[in-house]
């Protein structure tokens, strides 16, 4: 698929999540899609499991993309996630698309942390 269509698929996915329109969110995935969370060692296989996880989610985040990069059938999103608890999370999502829908999503996320004092003399501070 053209890169602009792949980007639009991921943008609709984010829109669905942010609007709590899970039908729109799930429509962007293939039924046999896989979601992987390497940090927690989890893999969600297939639409039935994905719908169950998101249906049971105690508090879906609002996703604010900071950057979206597209290369062929791969879309990478750097984002800030707000779970409504006052703590922003930083995340990177790697979406692999097939025929205009997500076939695989790999997600990494963390909360901001204090910079180490030992390297302060060599770095510049940036806004998270």
Model segments located where?
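Short acidic-aromatic low-complexity motifs
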Residues: 2-28
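Small-side-chain structural scaffolding
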Residues: 10, 16-18, 33, 38, ...
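A solvent-exposed, acidic/Ser-Thr-rich amphipathic alpha-helical stretch
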Residues: 22-73
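A beta-strand edge to alpha-helix "cap/lid" segment located at domain peripheries
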Residues: 1-5, 51-128
């Amino acid at each position: 698929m053209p890169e602009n269509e792949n980007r639009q698929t991921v943008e609709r996915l984010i829109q669905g999540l942010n609007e709590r329109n899970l039908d729109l969110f799930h429509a962007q995935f293939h039924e046999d899609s896989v979601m992987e969370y390497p940090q927690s060692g989890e893999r969600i296989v297939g639409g039935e499991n994905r719908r169950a996880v998101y249906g049971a989610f105690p508090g879906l985040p609002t996703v604010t993309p900071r950057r979206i990069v597209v290369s062929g059938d791969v879309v990478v999103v750097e984002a800030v996630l707000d779970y409504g608890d006052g703590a922003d999370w930083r995340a990177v999502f790697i979406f692999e698309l097939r025929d205009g829908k997500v076939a695989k999503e790999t997600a990494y996320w963390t909360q901001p942390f204090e910079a180490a004092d030992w390297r302060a003399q060599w770095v510049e501070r940036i806004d998270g």
